């Protein structure tokens, strides 16, 4: 299963969240799931990627080209999609995922989460958008 994770890219996050999201990533990797995420190396995005990779899972990043500067993107992705815009990034995340998980984050995380919840409401299961969504 390809699981899209939305979460903080900031390093200004409580260490307990980092620990918890790394554990979530390890659990995903152990179960053979693939992490699909915004490609960030820091914050909860990076924690999820490190945890998933440490447990042998695959990691796919998606980010606009303008984020491709030293230290911003997770360097150990199995595959990386570069986009021209944030909207294209969100579309790839939506199209490629079987399920979505939102962990603590900021405005970007809320934007991504609310779009998924809106799609679920507008297209109930069987109506074109049947992926699952969860908050952690």
Please report, for each region that a protein language model flagged, where it lies by residue:
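A cross-family phosphate/adenosyl-ligand binding-site feature
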Residues: 1-96, 135
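Conserved phosphate- and dinucleotide-binding cores of soluble alpha/beta proteins
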Residues: 83-95, 99-136
């Amino acid at each position: 299963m390809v699981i899209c994770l939305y979460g903080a890219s900031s390093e200004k996050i409580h260490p307990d969240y980092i620990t918890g999201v790394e554990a979530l990533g390890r659990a995903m990797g152990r179960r053979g799931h693939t992490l699909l995420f915004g490609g960030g190396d820091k914050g909860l995005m990076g924690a999820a990627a490190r945890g998933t990779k440490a447990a042998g899972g695959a990691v796919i990043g998606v980010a606009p080209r303008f984020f491709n500067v030293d230290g911003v993107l997770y360097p150990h992705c199995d595959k990386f999609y570069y986009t021209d815009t944030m909207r294209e990034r969100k579309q790839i995340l939506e199209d490629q995922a079987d399920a979505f998980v939102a962990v603590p984050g900021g405005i970007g995380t809320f934007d991504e989460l609310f779009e998924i919840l809106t799609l679920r409401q507008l297209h109930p299961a069987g109506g074109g958008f049947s992926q699952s969504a969860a908050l952690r």
